[in-house]
UniProtKB/Swiss-Prot annotation:
Topology relative to the membrane: Multi-pass membrane protein
Gene: Mrgprg
Cellular component GO terms held in the UniProt record: plasma membrane
Protein name in UniProt: Mas-related G-protein coupled receptor member G
This protein's UniProt keywords: Cell membrane, G-protein coupled receptor, Membrane, Receptor, Transducer, Transmembrane, Transmembrane helix
Protein task: Orphan receptor. May regulate nociceptor function and/or development, including the sensation or modulation of pain.
Source organism: Rattus norvegicus (Rat)
Amino acid sequence: MLSIFNIWGTFNRVLFFLSLTVSLAGLAGNTLLLWHLGLRIKKGPFNTYLLHLAAADFLFLSCQVGFSIAKIASGYEDTLYFPVTFLWFAVGLWLLAAFIVDCCLSYMFPSFCGPNCRPRYTSFVLCLVIWALTMLAVLLPANACGLLYNRMSLLVCLKYHWVSVVWLGVLASTACGASMFLLVFGNCCSSQPPSKFCKLAQCSGILLFFCRLPLVFYWCLRPVIKFLLPFFFPLATLLACIDSSAKPLLYYLKGRQLRKEPLQVALNRALGEESQSSSGGISLPMSRV
């Protein structure tokens, strides 16, 4: 029995330090990404989402590093660790869902939902609304369920938690469905190839499915999973850190054309909002008609 506890303790420590290492690397990448998106690249509807998403990932990884260092120093985990880190994680999930759905609608209906068919600051205003609403959607159930303080009201907790579970389920399923649509129909059923932002949405949707959904499941079923699968939370945390840290590398790889191309050139190519043709949309190639 003692050896089982030793194995579990070693496994938990390995996941903890892996998460810390990935978070530190992701902080460096998202810092560079924020600098390029914020100061060096002209803003447009799509890269506005990515700028706010990078900010949410930066805050998530910063809190991850800060609470991890505090745990190393004090020897115990702060009670605010999970609700605070999940807050920025949820902001990123909502922003990612908005970005993927916007790319999907622009691809399906370029004449009505394209970048040139909307008010200039639509994406910016939507991002601000997402930041504000996520604060309420996470902090209210966290407070009612005793995650922020030790006071808990069972009926109020169940009511708020049920609303947050439905909200997260709708966000995750919408984002996964839209990215799957872009992946299948964009590559098989259209004569117009997907734009670079649609391709980024496809890759981001795959990352979301494998790396973000586990932490969403943990939030929804926290008491049950914590009791039955104690290793699930550190593993889900590691996957969430990988997702938040991988995006700068993903953007660089999507924008790079030459082997030793400068970072700024690759990011400008991947995230710049140059004018794109509005002749997209879903249509069968002539060879298939």
